[in-house]
Regions:
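Residue-level detection of the helix-turn-helix DNA-binding "recognition helix"
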Residues: 22, 36, 47-49, 76
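Residue-level signal for the short linker/turn that defines the boundary of a DNA-recognition helix
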Residues: 15, 26, 52-55
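Short alpha-helical DNA-recognition segment
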Residues: 25-44
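Amphipathic, hydrophobic secondary-structure cores in small proteins
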Residues: 44-58
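DNA major-groove recognition helix of helix-turn-helix/homeodomain DNA-binding modules
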Residues: 55-70
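Short, charged recognition helix plus adjacent turn
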Residues: 1-8, 44, 72-79
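A short, Lys/Arg-rich alpha-helix, primarily the initiator
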Residues: 1-24
Length: 79
């Protein structure tokens, strides 16, 4: 996969993570407390600056009560 497409995908995942947090009425501090990840790491994912690995994705989805497909851009919209 070309680097440009990979970066764009990470940004889309980050945008969806941010929207899922808003929908769950959860800020970075709360999500960090539930998952054990730092607020800085969560921000890096939101901004698309860090790759989100499957184990991290599952933990975030569990805390946010969303399906992984919602963050992985497999749906057109986050409902």
């Amino acid at each position: 996969m070309p680097r440009e497409n990979h970066v764009a995908k990470q940004r889309r995942i980050g945008e969806r993570l941010s929207r899922a947090m808003v929908k769950a009425h959860m800020d970075r501090k709360e999500l960090a407390a539930l998952t054990g990840y730092s607020e800085t790491q969560i921000l890096s994912w939101e901004l698309g600056r860090a790759e989100l690995y499957p184990t991290e994705l599952i933990k975030l989805c569990h805390a946010l009560d969303v399906m992984p497909e919602c963050l992985l851009c497999w749906e057109r919209r986050l409902h």
